[in-house]
Amino acid sequence: EGAKGVDLIQELKKARAEGKVLRVVFLGVNGVGKTLTIAKVARRLMMTGFKPVIAAADTFRAGAIEQLENYASEVGVEVVSRKYGSDPASVVYDAVQRAIARGMDAVLADTAGRMHTNVNLVEELRKILRIAGEPQLKILVLDALSGNDVLYQAKYFMDHVGFDGMIFTKVDANAKCGGIITAVHQTHRPILFIGTGQSYDDLEEFRVDAFLSEILG
C-alpha cells in the first residue's frame, strides 16, 4: 500500500558487489524485543552466507550489553562493545572499522530506546547514523501487541530520524494485529520480517497476502 520494497539480502548483495559493508541500524523503544531481533537477523544472515558483526551501541540501559553478548554468543556472532556510558557512535564506528578490516558484510547496530525519558536520544541516534556512514539501512523494531503505541512510535521515529523498513515482534501471540497494517499505511515503509517466537529461527519474511488472510480469515 504505497510502501516501497526493501530486501535486506538484496541490499547485502549489492553492498558486497561494491566491496562495501552494509550498516544496519536498529531503532525502537525499550521492551519491544530489539536485542533478540538483532540476534535473529544475524543468524539469518549467517545462514544465507553473510558475515555480520554486532555493535552494542545501547550503552545506556543496564544489562543491554550483556544481554546482546549472550544472544550473540549463542548464534555465533562477534560483538563490538565498550563500557556503559561510552559514546554509542564510537561503538558503531569501531564495529564498521572491524568489519572493513576483516572483510565482513554487515554491521548490525543496537541502539538505546529511552524515547520517553531522554530528549538527547534523538541527537544520539542522529550522530550514530552520521558516523555509521553509507550504505545504510535503518530498521524500526515494533511490538505487534502494542496497539495504538505502534503508530505513535512509528511516527516518532519517522519524524525524528526516519527509517527504511520495520520488523514486528510478538506476532505469534496474536495474529489479528491491525496496528501492523496501519503502520505500513501511515509510514509508507515496508515490513521486512515478523518475529513469531523466542527461538533464533523464529523470524519470517512478511508476506502481506498471508497476513491479510489471517486477519480476514
What are these regions (language model features)?
Residues K4, L8, V75-G76, T111, ...:
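Glycine-rich, flexible loop/turn motifs
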Residues D87-R102, H116-G217:
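Conserved catalytic-core segment of NTP-binding enzymes
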Residues E1-A57, A64-Y84, V91-I100, D105-A109:
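Primarily NTPase-proximal linker/entry elements flanking Walker-type ATP/GTP-binding cores
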Residues N30, A112-G113, D143:
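Short glycine-/small-residue-rich Rossmann-like dinucleotide-binding loops
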